[in-house]
Amino acid sequence: MDNSKERLEVILDKLKEIEYGVAVIRSNEPQFPYTSGPRDYQIQAFENWKTNKQKGLFAMATGTGKTITSLNCLLEIYKRLGYYKALILVPTITLVDQWEKECAKFNFTNVIKVCSKYSGWQTSLANIRMLELTNPDNKQSYVIISTYASFIRPANFIELNQFPKNKLLFIADEAHNMGAGLIAKRLNDIKYSRRIGLSATPERQ
């Protein structure tokens, strides 16, 4: 994704806020960020995803709310279980920051950004991994946002591969990138029970 496309995504997000209406007054609880609630097609996307054993590809045009649609699925998980756990992969550092902002709109907290731009995330990941290993029934909520480049590095991959595959929602933005070389090989080694791919171009040439 080039810089011009990333800027377009930011502009479309701003227009989307206007279209949805005034944001919901914030509380400590995760919630949908707009008073109008999710659109019909976003509700249907969640229902289809749930029917398909919580697996699916959301192939949607730019500006139609792929990010909101996928985070709404995480919100529905929270409503049912009382906690949320997610690993989100994106192709660029700019999108790491953009996804963090979208998570904040839903009031998703404890966001860990895994990429070369930031430091300290190794300790945060290690602490959460230890909690998951020592207390598998914990209800600690967190969202890990990583670039594909950071995800496929051996040390990071080993760390992330120890997170609970049956409780964590895996979201791959620009999912057609997963068809590339080492990324595809790494993902073949991980079997997440809950998966969402996001793409405007699902067919890889």
For each feature predicted by the language model, list its residue ranges:
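Conserved helix-turn-beta segment of the N-terminal RecA-like "Helicase ATP-binding" lobe
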Residues: 94-125
